[in-house]
Amino acid sequence: MDIELILLIVVLFLTPYLIALFIIFNPPYCILDYLLYKKYRKAKEEWHYITSTNMGMNRSRWIFILIVEIIALCSGFYILININRPHDEILTFSLIFLFIAIIYDKLTPASGTVEIYKEGIAVYIKIFNTLKPFLNRYIVLPWKFFKGYKIKSKNNTKYVILVPKSRLFFSIYLIDRDGNVEKTIRNHLNPIQ
C-alpha cells in the first residue's frame, strides 16, 4: 500500500476528532480556556490573597525549545530544497515530531505569574509556542494538589519548586527574590529532600 494512501485514510478518519480537539483546546477562544478562566475568576473572588511572584523556566524547557526550532528550520529548508521530490518518510517524521512537540508545549509552562492564596495558587501561564506565541492559560490549584516543595538556587536566583503529587503534571518553579515566597509556601506545604 502506498504511503500517500495511508496518510489520506488517516487524515480522513481523524478529521472529525481533530476538529473536536480544535474547538476544545485551541486558544484563545476555546471551551477549555473559558472553563479555566471561569474557575480562576471564582477563586479570585472567594480565596484570600497573600502575594504573587513570577514563574521561572528550567533548563530542560530551554533545550526543548531549541530542539523544536532546529528541527522546524531543518524541515523547512529540506522542503524548500527538495520541493519537487521530497521523501515521504522525512516529511511524515517531521510532522509527527512537530505534533508531539506542540502537545508537549501546551502541557509545559514557559513563564507566567503565580498568585499565592491561603487556599492554593492561581497560575497565569504564558506558553511559548512556535506557531502561536504566548498563548495564555489560567490554572487554579489547591494546596492538596502538591506533595511538597524544594528549594534550588542557580545564578544568584532562588527558586521554590512546587512538586505535584501526579507525575503527569509539571513542577512549578517560583522565583523567590526576597524570601517571602518560601515563608508563605512553608505554611502550607512540607519540604521535600
Curated annotation (Swiss-Prot):
Membrane topology: Multi-pass membrane protein
Main location per the UniProt record: membrane
Subcellular location: Cell membrane
Annotated transmembrane regions: 5-25, 63-83, 90-110
GO cellular component: plasma membrane
Keywords noted in UniProt: Cell membrane, Membrane, Transmembrane, Transmembrane helix
The keyword Transmembrane helix appears for this protein: yes
Protein name: Uncharacterized protein MJ0226.1
Organism: Methanocaldococcus jannaschii (strain ATCC 43067 / DSM 2661 / JAL-1 / JCM 10045 / NBRC 100440)
Source lineage: Archaea, Methanobacteriati, Methanobacteriota, Methanomada group, Methanococci
